[in-house]
Regions:
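N-terminal beta1-alpha1-beta2 submodule of the flavodoxin-like/Rossmannoid cofactor-binding fold
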Residues: 1-84, 88-106, 110-111, 166-186
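Short beta-strand elements in bilobed, periplasmic/extracellular small-molecule ligand-binding domains
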Residues: 31-36, 150-161
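Short, solvent-exposed coil/turn elements at secondary-structure transition points
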Residues: 38-40, 129, 159-164
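Short, glycine-/small-residue-rich phosphate/pyrophosphate-handling segment
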Residues: 110-156
Length: 186
């Protein structure tokens, strides 16, 4: 099973490195593709709506922008894990990724059909901060709004692998939470 793991942090190392190391120890069961947004430039959407004609983001931006590369990986993955710290809000590169996904999926009409390539993907979203695991419900709601066929901010309706109501009470740290969720795919 191919799992795309998107780390939303602006920093390399730290908690992300710990999680990646533990996940790699399970590489005999899973084919992981790790994307660290700290290594990738994601430009903000300009609402040019050209993706509505092509189904791909055609934003005339620098060659360093990696949105389409990440989107293509999302489409081919069997499962998507988004792991991100919460500083004061969602990190800006992760927000830009969500924003661009919205435009490509919505403007191309994919959201109004049954061909959304991300619609029934297995997904898990994890939030953490310096004091431990954070409530990931707000980020799940944002992901629903931006990516899935929902467009509601009041509640999450996408079926996540990590549906725990209070993960901070169930797990000692974010790594244990991620690995517990990963076991569901075995």
């Amino acid at each position: 099973m191919r799992i795309l793991v998107v780390f939303g942090s602006h920093r390399l190392g730290g908690t992300n490195a710990e999680i990646e190391k533990v996940m790699k120890a399970k590489s005999d069961k899973f084919d992981f593709d790790f994307v660290h947004l700290a290594d990738h430039k994601i430009e903000s959407c300009t609402s040019c709506h050209q993706c509505g004609k092509t189904g791909r983001c055609t934003l005339p931006i620098s060659d360093n922008d990696r949105f389409q590369e990440i989107f293509d990986k999302m489409k081919t993955a069997d499962a998507i894990f988004i792991i991100s710290p919460v500083y004061a809000a969602i990190p800006s590169r992760l927000t830009a990724l969500f924003e661009r996904l919205t435009s490509v999926l919505y403007d191309s009409g994919v959201m109004n059909t049954d061909i959304n390539p991300l619609l029934d993907k297995k997904a898990a979203i994890f939030s953490y901060c310096s004091c431990g695991i954070c409530d990931d419900t707000p980020m799940k709601i944002i992901f629903d709004k931006f990516v899935m066929k929902n467009y509601r901010f009041d509640k999450s309706t996408y079926s996540y692998l990590n549906a725990s109501k209070k993960p901070q009470d169930e797990y000692p740290n974010i790594t244990a939470y991620v690995m517990s969720t990963l076991k569901q795919l075995c």
